[in-house]
């Protein structure tokens, strides 16, 4: 029954969703304290919001179908007469007033409640002719529908300014909804705002427990934890804005249009030159979902870089073996570092970040006070001179390249402060799209979040600029499967639990992911 969609979401097991008659999506604009109107009107003028509303509620995948919009009587009356009914959509008006008679108006139907509206739309002819159902107001309708089990998604224009309102709706229950997509901030008529779509991923807070994993463990994800596995019910214009499609589209472009090249490892690659991806860190964390990313490895390696260590054995002792190949006896001998102890990687990333210019001897030496500490310099400039255009950290030191087990691939980062937000652009000269790039995206997004935390800022953008973006020939079939067949899920949310403001005080347990439910791990061999 449709009434189940507006009632208790469970059937006794705590996680099983009732068989819906008709679900719906909510479209709303609201301030940070969920104000939506004043004196029966919108207290802001945002033409782009009107366009967004039209695009979301009118878009259908089947040109022979249309969408339905459910609204209360006051919302109907607030629409200018010349725009009533909203064109191209079935207008469902909720009212219990016997004097309200518009039944003769084309493309308009009247229902007494949300329950009766959903039941109507579940029956003939609307079950066939109506593709999606959107709830568009007003306050009482939103309060009834927003967090109810029948709500699959919420498309919200999030207004960051304080604007006086007299009508409010409940906060979105973020224990069961996660961001699918959030636009970069826009400013219109001096109002800063963004468009964010949240999707329902679970029915109850109880399900959240199994989704919340600290990085101290890397247990297998249970794909059954997410009630919804396929989010293609979203309007196409929203569905395709998921930021994972930046990565998937780049992989697809390389496979389809790349140039075949030889490489140092003699594996062979298909590559393109010069590309960029931009990720929004404000609402979610860009840990790819079409294949499982080794999150614990991301965290431990970044903390290892920050410590300035060049000893691969430290990572290996923690079960992180990503540097084992480049630190092996066989590999070090093959590049002429025959006197180097196994596991000693030379003056690579962490050394350059913390001791740039110091003379490298071996991984056991104490380099305290030696060289230039770029990381602390970055933090100092962000705190004391945030408008500086020289907030830069470089791992590329030409005089040390011959001493490194592997010259830096991700070699240069610049930080930028605006509107209380910290953004980072990283340049990567060589990008292994299969194994390296998912790791690199997560690592620099995490670094940005950590520095923002230390500097009392919030994360902004992570911009990933790539020189040679390539797919190794032995990864082609696996990445073809990922980029052409897998559908992304929601990115997780990152919580930093530490109250520490010292970049060197973080521990792996300080970072918690909420709602990471990726597809299965894809085994790919690393080219050494």
Curated annotation (Swiss-Prot):
Pathway: Cofactor biosynthesis; tetrahydrofolate biosynthesis; 5,6,7,8-tetrahydrofolate from 7,8-dihydrofolate: step 1/1
GO cellular component, one term: mitochondrion
InterPro entries per record: DHFR-like_dom_sf, DHFR-TS, DHFR_CS, DHFR_dom, Thymidate_synth/dCMP_Mease, Thymidate_synth/dCMP_Mease_dom, Thymidate_synth/dCMP_Mease_sf, Thymidylate_synthase
Pfam families: DHFR_1 (PF00186), Thymidylat_synt (PF00303)
EC assignment: 1.5.1.3, 2.1.1.45
GO molecular function terms attached to this record: dihydrofolate reductase activity; thymidylate synthase activity
Domain DHFR: 23-200
Domain of life: Eukaryota
Keyword S-adenosyl-L-methionine: no
Keywords, in A-Z order: Methyltransferase, Multifunctional enzyme, NADP, Nucleotide biosynthesis, One-carbon metabolism, Oxidoreductase, Transferase
Keyword Transmembrane: no
Positions of region (Disordered): 1-20
Gene3D superfamilies on file: Dihydrofolate Reductase, subunit A (3.40.430.10), Thymidylate synthase/dCMP hydroxymethylase domain (3.30.572.10)
Reactions this protein catalyses: (6S)-5,6,7,8-tetrahydrofolate + NADP(+) = 7,8-dihydrofolate + NADPH + H(+); dUMP + (6R)-5,10-methylene-5,6,7,8-tetrahydrofolate = 7,8-dihydrofolate + dTMP
Residues annotated to bind NADP(+): 29, 35-41, 73-75, 94-97, 137-144
Protein family: In the N-terminal section; belongs to the dihydrofolate reductase family. In the C-terminal section; belongs to the thymidylate synthase family.
Role according to the record: Bifunctional enzyme. Involved in de novo dTMP biosynthesis. Key enzyme in folate metabolism. Can play two different roles depending on the source of dihydrofolate: de novo synthesis of tetrahydrofolate or recycling of the dihydrofolate released as one of the end products of the TS catalyzed reaction. Catalyzes an essential reaction for de novo glycine and purine synthesis, DNA precursor synthesis, and for the conversion of dUMP to dTMP.
The protein's name in its UniProt record: Bifunctional dihydrofolate reductase-thymidylate synthase
Lineage: Eukaryota, Viridiplantae, Streptophyta, Embryophyta, Tracheophyta
């Amino acid at each position: 029954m449709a009434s189940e969609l507006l009632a208790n979401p469970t059937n006794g097991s705590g996680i099983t969703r009732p068989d819906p008659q008709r679900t719906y999506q909510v479209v709303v604009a609201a301030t940070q304290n969920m104000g939506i109107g004043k004196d029966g009107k919108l207290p802001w003028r945002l033409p782009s919001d009107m366009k967004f509303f039209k695009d979301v509620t009118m878009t259908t995948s089947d040109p022979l179908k249309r969408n339905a919009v459910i609204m209360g009587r006051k919302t109907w009356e607030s629409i200018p007469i010349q725009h009533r009914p909203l064109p191209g959509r079935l207008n469902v008006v909720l009212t219990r007033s016997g004097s309200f008679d518009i039944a003769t108006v084309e493309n308009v139907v009247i229902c007494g409640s949300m329950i009766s509206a959903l039941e109507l739309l579940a029956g003939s002819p609307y079950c066939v002719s109506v593709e999606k159902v959107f709830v568009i107001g007003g306050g009482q309708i939103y309060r009834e529908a927003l967090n109810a089990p029948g709500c699959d998604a919420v498309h919200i224009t999030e207004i960051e300014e304080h604007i006086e309102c007299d009508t409010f709706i409940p906060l979105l229950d973020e224990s069961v909804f996660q961001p699918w997509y959030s636009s970069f901030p826009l400013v219109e008529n001096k109002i800063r705002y963004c468009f964010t779509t949240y999707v329902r991923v679970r029915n109850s807070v109880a399900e959240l427990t199994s989704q919340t994993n600290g990085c101290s463990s890397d247990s297998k994800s249970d794909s059954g934890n997410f009630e919804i596995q396929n989010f293609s019910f979203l309007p196409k214009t929203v569905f395709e804005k998921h930021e994972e499609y930046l990565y998937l589209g780049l992989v697809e472009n390389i496979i389809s249009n790349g140039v075949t090249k030889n490489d140092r490892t003699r594996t062979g690659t298909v590559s393109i030159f010069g590309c960029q991806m931009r990720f929004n860190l404000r609402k979610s964390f860009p840990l790819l979902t079409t294949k499982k990313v080794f999150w614990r490895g991301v965290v431990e390696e970044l903390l290892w870089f920050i410590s300035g260590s060049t000893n691969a054995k430290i990572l290996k002792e923690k079960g992180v073996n990503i540097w084992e190949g480049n630190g092996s006896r066989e590999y070090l001998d093959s590049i002429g570092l025959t006197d180097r102890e196994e596991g000693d990687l030379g003056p690579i990333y962490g050394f350059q970040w913390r001791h740039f210019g110091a003379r490298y001897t071996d991984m056991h030496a104490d380099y305290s006070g030696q060289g230039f500490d770029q990381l602390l310099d970055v933090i100092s400039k962000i705190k004391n001179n945030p408008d500086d255009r020289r907030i830069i950290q470089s791992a590329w030191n030409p005089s040390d390249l011959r001493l490194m087990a592997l010259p830096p691939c991700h070699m240069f980062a610049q930080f930028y402060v605006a509107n209380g937000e910290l953004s980072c652009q990283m340049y990567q000269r060589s990008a292994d799209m299969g194994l390296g790039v998912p790791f690199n995206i997560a690592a620099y997004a995490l670094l940005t979040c950590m520095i923002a935390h230390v500097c009392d800022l919030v994360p902004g953008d992570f911009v990933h600029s790539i020189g040679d973006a390539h797919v190794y020939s032995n990864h082609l079939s696996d990445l073809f499967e990922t980029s052409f067949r897998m559908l992304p899920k929601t990115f997780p949310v990152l919580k930093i639990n530490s109250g520490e403001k010292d970049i060197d005080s973080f521990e792996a347990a300080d970072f918690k992911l909420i709602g990471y439910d990726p597809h299965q791990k894809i085994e790919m061999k690393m080219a050494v």
